[in-house]
Amino acid sequence: MTHEEHHATKTLGIGKAIAVLTSGGDAQGMNAAVRAVVRVGIFTGARVFFVHEGYQGLVDGGDHIKEATWESVSMMLQLGGTVIGSARCKDFREREGRLRAAYNLVKRGITNLCVIGGDGSLTGADTFRSEWSDLLSDLQKAGKITDEEATKSSYLNIVGLVGSIDNDFCGTDMTIGTDSALHRIIEIVDAITTTAQSHQRTIVLEVMGRHCGYLALVTSLSCGADWVFIPECPPDDDWEEHLCRRLSETRTRGSRLNIIIVAEGAIDKNGKPITSEDIKNLVVKRLGYDTRVTVLGHVQRGGTPSAFDRILGSRMGVEAVMALLEGTPDTPACVVSLSGNQAVRLPLMECVQVTKDVTKAMDEKKFDEALKLRGRSFMNNWEVYKLLAHVRPPVSKSGSHTVAVMNVGAPAAGMNAAVRSTVRIGLIQGNRVLVVHDGFEGLAKGQIEEAGWSYVGGWTGQGGSKLGTKRTLPKKSFEQISANITKFNIQGLVIIGGFEAYTGGLELMEGRKQFDELCIPFVVIPATVSNNVPGSDFSVGADTALNTICTTCDRIKQSAAGTKRRVFIIETMGGYCGHLATMAGLAAGADAAYIFGEPFTIRDLQANVEHLVQKMKTTVKRGLVLRNEKCNENYTTDFIFNLYSEEGKGIFDSRKNVLGHMQQGGSPTPFDRNFATKMGAKAMNWMSGKIKESYRNGRIFANTPDSGCVLGMRKRALVFQPVAELKDQTDFEHRIPKEQWWLKLRPILKILAKYEIDLDTSDHAHLEHITRKRSGEAAV
């Protein structure tokens, strides 16, 4: 990219005006998006306006449309809801209302509109855009606007960001607010679980989702529910019988509680609603269990946005500004959305159409079609739920294989969820599943036992590692490990852990030359707070650590805001990998994040101090600086603290916090529970296939490179990659992958902190078309 192109982003918005509004139901993370739109808009030289109270503010004009400043979006990131207000607006549905809205925009020279809301809000925006030229000619005829004003505002650019806790919009994997809503639900499920266990109760939990069962489905995966009712997949006609049998089976196996999750729009095959009360009455009447209903309601919309939603909102906000300013009269109104971890632009009306098609398919009782249209991610969730909740392990173990599961490295939240789904999917497939305590050390010492179905009951929501985990590598103990593989007849190995799990995998590959016993398939599931395992964009546990850091940063910022003129320097974990520091910097609104992956000098430190000196002259008199623990051996946390203290004398004072091992603890977030559960299921499916493939002459012999893999999330898919092939992509000295996708997000962090830098637009989203899944097509 040339310097001219770089420079173009800083002048892209000169002479242009952008209005941002939030409409429809509020969602956590909307404020992060508003903040990003305002700051990136100002960065490009554009004027940015808040439209208060959604479309109603657009119609009413006056003080509802105000110009935004850099400081006016400060301290917004950690707030739930929408600071600029939202309202359901009848006026905008009428042409007269849209005419007044057009007049208000033209008078202010605004030709770019960023709408953050659900499908109704975005459809309204598209209607507005398609009528724009007719509305202008009506205003001209009425003499309300001049010919010059009409020419200047000849076309309207519209970009939508989907803010909806239901995740009911087709074309995007996650809508802004969904992850935070899941946080609220899971907090409540965890709290209710303890009281239900004490009294041996059945809990019926109703969550939001009139036409979309995403929240209910992911909640059931994240808490190991016994049953879920969602509108897209109504239960079979004899569901009452099946449900009661399932609940009593769970109790017989020693469980003290049952959890049933119901989406508010749940229906049966004939379209008749299934209510929480119906389910409660059924369980009480047929089984006599003490059953309680909890309807969550608007709690789900409330509270602090999760780290995921803050980062999603910020990334989408940046993309929205770029899409608006690059727009021409010929570009269609688009939605900025997320696919895997990639930002994409999709034509707004294509997405709205597919979203309507889902509702239509459900109305016509074509439920398979509705499920396909929901997309790949939804279908994967449904398949894993069905396996874990509805398929029973076979009674006979004849012809079964033996698979061992272990944790390696440091503890990470979500490890237990991965172990649970690996064990249970293994049992469902008719295998014997062994669990190994204390990693490779335990494998060498024979700390191995067989796991049954209830062995891993209730593990999904528990943090840390219940099996015990060690950083020990296998090389020194190959003889003992080989002996135990033979003794316990282990035919496959699932290794859940961090960089040591990956390195251990490489050592096992090498050891195959000497020890035939090591020629068994193995798969590594990345699980570490550092997110530094080659072959995967995400690791189990990183999201939980990120949320822990965010919560702490919010509290520290609050303290600094009260004290005034104070800068906090916070040290995060991650070894040499700067993922936690960078992402927490984005999510908590840090002024700087020092990491090993982006070398810095004393001049950079001085520039940051000078930047904070300037910041103290504004209304925002506080600073937050993050430092990755191994970003530089000489510029330590103490050094940076001392430098800031000296240079800031008389202007600001400094404090330091080393967060330490609290980042490894805590209950796993919904993202980590769900991600770990799906990874475990996928790993075990692969393992069963590989064992069958490698079975020759009555024994397993696997010595091909593809029989030892890392299962990783790469851009938009879960893929198995041979560990040997990942060797070249690894910096072993610093225990990090050579290429890390999140480094591309660092310029956004700097721009949002008001640094004058170049923004490389080469990696921005381009317009794509929505891929539609029809009946009969396989989910990837």
From Swiss-Prot:
<keyword id="KW-0325">Glycoprotein</keyword>
<dbReference type="InterPro" id="IPR009161">
    <property type="entry name" value="6-Pfructokinase_euk"/>
</dbReference>
<dbReference type="GO" id="GO:0016020">
    <property type="term" value="C:membrane"/>
</dbReference>
<keyword id="KW-0479">Metal-binding</keyword>
<dbReference type="GO" id="GO:0061621">
    <property type="term" value="P:canonical glycolysis"/>
</dbReference>
<feature type="binding site" description="in other chain">
    <location>
        <begin position="164"/>
        <end position="166"/>
    </location>
    <ligand>
        <name>substrate</name>
    </ligand>
</feature>
<keyword id="KW-0324">Glycolysis</keyword>
<dbReference type="GO" id="GO:0070095">
    <property type="term" value="F:fructose-6-phosphate binding"/>
</dbReference>
<dbReference type="InterPro" id="IPR041914">
    <property type="entry name" value="PFK_vert-type"/>
</dbReference>
<dbReference type="GO" id="GO:0016208">
    <property type="term" value="F:AMP binding"/>
</dbReference>
<keyword id="KW-0021">Allosteric enzyme</keyword>
<dbReference type="InterPro" id="IPR015912">
    <property type="entry name" value="Phosphofructokinase_CS"/>
</dbReference>
<keyword id="KW-0963">Cytoplasm</keyword>
<feature type="active site" description="Proton acceptor">
    <location>
        <position position="166"/>
    </location>
</feature>
<keyword id="KW-0418">Kinase</keyword>
<dbReference type="GO" id="GO:0048029">
    <property type="term" value="F:monosaccharide binding"/>
</dbReference>
<comment type="function">
    <text>Catalyzes the phosphorylation of D-fructose 6-phosphate to fructose 1,6-bisphosphate by ATP, the first committing step of glycolysis.</text>
</comment>
<dbReference type="GO" id="GO:0005524">
    <property type="term" value="F:ATP binding"/>
</dbReference>
<feature type="binding site">
    <location>
        <position position="566"/>
    </location>
    <ligand>
        <name>beta-D-fructose 2,6-bisphosphate</name>
    </ligand>
</feature>
<feature type="modified residue" description="Phosphoserine">
    <location>
        <position position="667"/>
    </location>
</feature>
<feature type="region of interest" description="Interdomain linker">
    <location>
        <begin position="391"/>
        <end position="401"/>
    </location>
</feature>
<dbReference type="GO" id="GO:0042802">
    <property type="term" value="F:identical protein binding"/>
</dbReference>
<feature type="binding site" description="in other chain">
    <location>
        <position position="264"/>
    </location>
    <ligand>
        <name>substrate</name>
    </ligand>
</feature>
<dbReference type="GO" id="GO:0030388">
    <property type="term" value="P:fructose 1,6-bisphosphate metabolic process"/>
</dbReference>
<feature type="region of interest" description="C-terminal regulatory PFK domain 2">
    <location>
        <begin position="402"/>
        <end position="780"/>
    </location>
</feature>
<feature type="binding site">
    <location>
        <position position="292"/>
    </location>
    <ligand>
        <name>substrate</name>
    </ligand>
</feature>
<feature type="binding site">
    <location>
        <position position="119"/>
    </location>
    <ligand>
        <name>Mg(2+)</name>
    </ligand>
</feature>
<feature type="glycosylation site" description="O-linked (GlcNAc) serine">
    <location>
        <position position="530"/>
    </location>
</feature>
<feature type="binding site" description="in other chain">
    <location>
        <begin position="208"/>
        <end position="210"/>
    </location>
    <ligand>
        <name>substrate</name>
    </ligand>
</feature>
<keyword id="KW-0460">Magnesium</keyword>
<feature type="modified residue" description="N6-(2-hydroxyisobutyryl)lysine">
    <location>
        <position position="557"/>
    </location>
</feature>
<feature type="binding site" description="in other chain">
    <location>
        <begin position="573"/>
        <end position="575"/>
    </location>
    <ligand>
        <name>beta-D-fructose 2,6-bisphosphate</name>
    </ligand>
</feature>
<feature type="binding site" description="in other chain">
    <location>
        <begin position="298"/>
        <end position="301"/>
    </location>
    <ligand>
        <name>substrate</name>
    </ligand>
</feature>
<feature type="binding site" description="in other chain">
    <location>
        <begin position="661"/>
        <end position="664"/>
    </location>
    <ligand>
        <name>beta-D-fructose 2,6-bisphosphate</name>
    </ligand>
</feature>
<dbReference type="Pfam" id="PF00365">
    <property type="entry name" value="PFK"/>
</dbReference>
<feature type="binding site" description="in other chain">
    <location>
        <position position="629"/>
    </location>
    <ligand>
        <name>beta-D-fructose 2,6-bisphosphate</name>
    </ligand>
</feature>
<feature type="binding site">
    <location>
        <position position="201"/>
    </location>
    <ligand>
        <name>substrate</name>
    </ligand>
</feature>
<feature type="binding site">
    <location>
        <begin position="118"/>
        <end position="121"/>
    </location>
    <ligand>
        <name>ATP</name>
    </ligand>
</feature>
<dbReference type="GO" id="GO:0003872">
    <property type="term" value="F:6-phosphofructokinase activity"/>
</dbReference>
<keyword id="KW-0379">Hydroxylation</keyword>
<dbReference type="InterPro" id="IPR022953">
    <property type="entry name" value="ATP_PFK"/>
</dbReference>
<feature type="binding site" description="in other chain">
    <location>
        <position position="471"/>
    </location>
    <ligand>
        <name>beta-D-fructose 2,6-bisphosphate</name>
    </ligand>
</feature>
